[in-house]
Amino acid sequence: MIERDWEFEKIKKYKENALRENIYNKGNVKKYKECPYCGSKSFIKYGNYNRIQRYKCKNEECKKTFSNTTNSVWKYLKHKPEKWFEFIELMGEHTTLNECAAKLEISIVTAFYWRHKIFHAIENNYKPEKFDEVVYVDTYYTEKCYKGSRNKNYTYADKVKNKFDKMYGLVPRNVSVLIAEERGKMPLIRRTENDETIINNFNNNVLKIAAKDCYMRTDYFANKKLKNNLLQYNKKLSNATKKKYGLKIIGNRIEDKIKEDKKKNIMAYLTAWLSRYKGIATKYINHYYNFYSLIDSEKVFDYMSIFFELLKNGSYTSVEVLRTNHVEDY
């Protein structure tokens, strides 16, 4: 007698196992040269679990087991592998957490933590590596958002005032955002933290990856302190660079002979993109900026390549780390 399987459950199970096995094969995962817990280079194969190779550390003080998934961004994600692919694709389509949860049949809390696990992995793996020639530097200001905060307690009067302020545009835009972009490269977008200035933000994140004779270009509306900092920086450029771009320093401004093409207004696109999320807590905003930089990049990525890139290079981030890394300091 042939066993009935009208719902083709066995085929579905086989596809799931085959996909999981393919995901974690030797070519797709990080190869271990040492124990991820103690650093010992002495470890042995220790069987398989769900067709995934496991290992055991031979260090007497450790003796922990680990596998190809131990430091993967997908560690502890108990749902089917297909959902991990689908979730990245939905993120790229700016789908809300509610819609992701409904479509993938997961809880909103799970969707939230999946999103931030991926954000952390993307932030470690996809970032501007170097600026070489002409960098367009700009500043952008936004209001502070306390969405999801448990330490910020509002009275009814506070809520009424906040609603009134938003209605009439009275909310102070006191969060400064630094934008640095070079044609053909991934832009750098970063919020200025509470304990730093816009100048520190620029020096620590843009100058750090800029080539020696990189020209920093800005416009009239940029932050005055930042403009002055850029002026002092550009004065030190070599004569060859100044001649190349036709730089003339006139008082407190710089003129050049760079032909201005029709440049995309990155701030307008960024604001429109963020508005789809219906409010983002300021403590998380840098992750969204970094994700937008990936989307805005002229280099084309697809969700499959991102998945396997994060699988190989993205580091695992626990829920506990996500919570402690974003302590509410308002």
Regions of interest found by a model, annotated:
Residues 1-330:
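Residue-level recognition of single "structural anchor" positions
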